[in-house]
């Protein structure tokens, strides 16, 4: 899939919607993607002394503070998704309806990004200026634009990790996996983690479990943020 995406972006391969829909492209469970609490703290809170990398750091921090939101979901958030202090949206991958309370720290970061972003006349609906194509991944141009944005973010994230001297590899998946691992380490029920991430299922028995309220999921999110922010390095 990665090779195909590069080919489409370079114009060497035709764009075929949902080409890998019936092909398993999941992650090997043996491949560790989550950062330790110490490295995650450094990634999100140490000063990279670079405006370019600071913007990347803010985006990464928002992904973590939005309950491990994927880069695709963050990039495609529309302004209408922000309803006062709650984000309401459908996941790009599964179309699962999601709601995330925007913590005060996240609100400050959103304002930081807004203060430095230029208005995009052709696409005024996105919450952030990560994308500007108004087709929302429904055509080849939008698909290429998103793949390019994802590649650029991952490259800058690697630069950020290198500047902060992290030993572990990082990518856009790192924030999502790290949020889930932090919650698991803190004893949060797997059902709560799954629902907060917007996963469709973990076990058949989960169908019979009561859903968690937004207030409960917000407390889990606040706990994760507090744990990482206050983590004491060596």
Where are these regions (language model features)?
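DNA/chromatin major-groove-contacting recognition/catalytic segments
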Residues: 101-104, 112-113, 210-234
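Short, charged hinge/linker segments at domain and secondary-structure junctions
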Residues: 5-28, 123-129
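Basic, Lys/Arg- and aromatic-enriched nucleic-acid-binding interface segment
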Residues: 14-71, 75
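Conserved tyrosine-mediated DNA breakage-rejoining catalytic core shared by Y-recombinases
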Residues: 21-22, 76-112
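Catalytic-site neighborhood detector that most strongly recognizes the C-terminal catalytic loop/helix
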Residues: 34, 91-95, 134, 197-222
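Short, polar N-cap/turn motifs at the start of nucleic acid-interacting alpha helices
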Residues: 80-86, 166-168, 188-207, 233-234
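Active-site/catalytic core of tyrosine-dependent DNA strand-transfer enzymes
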Residues: 40, 103-167
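Short, basic (Lys/Arg/His-rich) helix/loop patches that form interaction surfaces
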Residues: 49-50, 145, 154-195
């Amino acid at each position: 899939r990665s090779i195909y995406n590069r080919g489409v972006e370079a114009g060497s391969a035709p764009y075929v919607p949902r080409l890998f829909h019936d092909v398993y492209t999941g992650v090997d469970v043996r491949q560790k993607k989550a950062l330790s609490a110490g490295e995650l703290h450094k990634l999100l809170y140490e000063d990279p002394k670079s405006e370019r990398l600071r913007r990347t750091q803010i985006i990464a921090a928002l992904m973590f503070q939005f309950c491990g939101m994927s880069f695709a979901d963050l990039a495609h958030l529309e302004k209408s998704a922000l309803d006062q202090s709650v984000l309401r949206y459908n996941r790009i991958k599964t179309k699962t309806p999601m709601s995330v309370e925007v913590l005060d720290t996240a609100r400050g970061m959103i304002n930081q990004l807004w203060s430095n972003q230029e208005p995009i006349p052709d696409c005024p609906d996105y919450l952030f200026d990560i994308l500007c194509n108004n087709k929302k991944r429904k055509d080849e141009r939008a698909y290429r634009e998103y793949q390019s944005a994802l590649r650029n973010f991952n490259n800058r994230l690697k630069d950020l990790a290198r500047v902060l001297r992290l030993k572990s590899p990082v990518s856009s998946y790192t924030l999502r996996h790290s949020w889930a691992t932090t919650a698991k380490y803190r004893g949060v029920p797997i059902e709560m983690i799954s629902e907060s991430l917007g996963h469709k299922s973990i076990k058949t028995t989960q169908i019979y479990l009561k859903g968690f309220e937004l207030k409960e999921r917000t407390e889990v999110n606040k706990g994760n943020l507090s744990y990482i922010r206050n983590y004491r390095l060596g």
